[in-house]
Amino acid sequence: GALISLTADTAAGRLTVEAGRSNFSLATLPREDFPVMASSEYASNFAAPAPVLRRLFDKSKFAISTEETRYYLNGVYLHIADAEGGKALRCVATDGHRLARIDAEMPEGAAEMPGVIVPRKTVGELRKLLDDDEMEIAVSVSETKIRFATPAITLTSKVIDGTFPDYTRVIPQGNTRKMEVDASDFARAVDRVATVSSE
């Protein structure tokens, strides 16, 4: 491949890129204009294995709403919740028609974590960082921001400023009618029926 040469002319506001016989001159902006995420104290700092976070977000993101008027549903609600085995790290997403709720064991240090709504776009970008099964992700959470840090990349995002609805009210309680089905058989049956469904 060709050797790429970058030359910055801050006075003229130009960046020259040269590679082989190609030459590009790009307009630039002053570095002072780049938005800076102000450093702040995080209420909670903990580490979670990449596979755990991957499972939480992969199994909940399909239910994120795309309706902009209900902006508080445009993300995944990440919080600490009471579960059967004690406290759990929980992801919840809903679009008003579907609801996904996924639990994982609460990581050490996460007990005081405030509940936050992680935006849909942040979930998508975070997912790209979670493919390494051996990686530990450092998570820092405040009322306004969330940060995910790997050894090579740090992703910081504002959280959605809103109140996630009380999803527990729409989950049936005390239901005595329960059944277990083979997941692959059930998926195939739903797939066949879906071909003639208009909704």
Tell me what each language-model feature is.
Residues 1-199:
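Structural preference for solvent-exposed beta-strand-turn elements
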